[in-house]
Design a protein with these regions (language model features):
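Regulatory sensory/coupling modules that transmit signals to nucleotide-handling catalytic cores
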Residues: 1-9, 117-124, 137, 146-148
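Amphipathic HAMP/coiled-coil signal-transducing linker helices
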Residues: 9-30
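Active-site loop/short helix in cyclic nucleotide turnover domains
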Residues: 19-22, 55-70, 84
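Active-site-proximal structural segments of metal-dependent nucleotidyl cyclase/transferase enzymes
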Residues: 36-58, 63-64
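Conserved helix-loop-beta segment at the catalytic/binding core of cyclic-nucleotide signaling proteins
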Residues: 41-46, 76-108
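Short helix/loop segment flanking the catalytic signature motif in cyclic-nucleotide metabolism enzymes
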Residues: 63-72, 101-119
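Alpha-helical scaffold within the catalytic cores of cyclic-nucleotide enzymes
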Residues: 76-84, 115-130
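A short glycine-enriched loop-to-beta-strand structural element that forms part of the catalytic core
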Residues: 91-107, 128-152
Length: 152
């Protein structure tokens, strides 16, 4: 898939904004999200620091990421936005299946602790936004991205 922002930056599943406590939350569509992810990856490589990507999806009964209906995805993105800094960016890592958030500022002294707190905050937020039948199936994966690709 060509993810060049010059060719089709915001096509189907494009960027959209959600109102969140009188603030607008910008959510990138898959092509734009990957474009900005590539920029962040290059920036982090130059600075010799890892780029942290959180991927969130809803597992079906077989453990496979399920397609998220619009009502669920909107609440998912609102929950993510309430859990991260406004300098982090969120969007579709994989359209309608996997949400992504890039943590652009990680505490340098204790990066693992900073990431753990963010994930815990996100889980608690999801528990308030969704019934247990949904929140228990939301999977949050932490990935460190380096020049060679995604590392689990």
């Amino acid at each position: 898939m060509d993810r060049s922002i010059n060719k089709a930056p915001l096509r189907t599943g494009a960027a959209f904004s959600l109102e969140l406590d009188r603030d607008l939350v910008h959510v990138y569509g898959e092509p734009a999200f990957h474009y900005f992810l590539d920029i962040e990856r290059a920036r982090f490589i130059r600075s010799a620091r890892p780029c942290v990507l959180l991927r969130v999806d809803l597992k079906d009964q077989h453990g496979i990421p399920a397609r998220l209906p619009q009502t669920l995805s909107e609440r998912l993105f609102l929950g993510i936005a309430k859990s991260v800094r406004d300098t982090d960016f969120i969007g579709w890592y994989e359209d309608e299946r996997v949400a992504g958030v890039v943590l652009t500022e990680i505490a340098e002294k204790q990066p693992d602790e900073s990431i753990r707190r963010t994930v815990d905050r996100m889980r608690r937020r999801f528990e308030t936004l969704f019934p247990v039948t949904v929140s228990s199936r939301l999977d949050i994966r932490v990935n460190t991205i380096r020049d060679e690709g995604v590392r689990n």
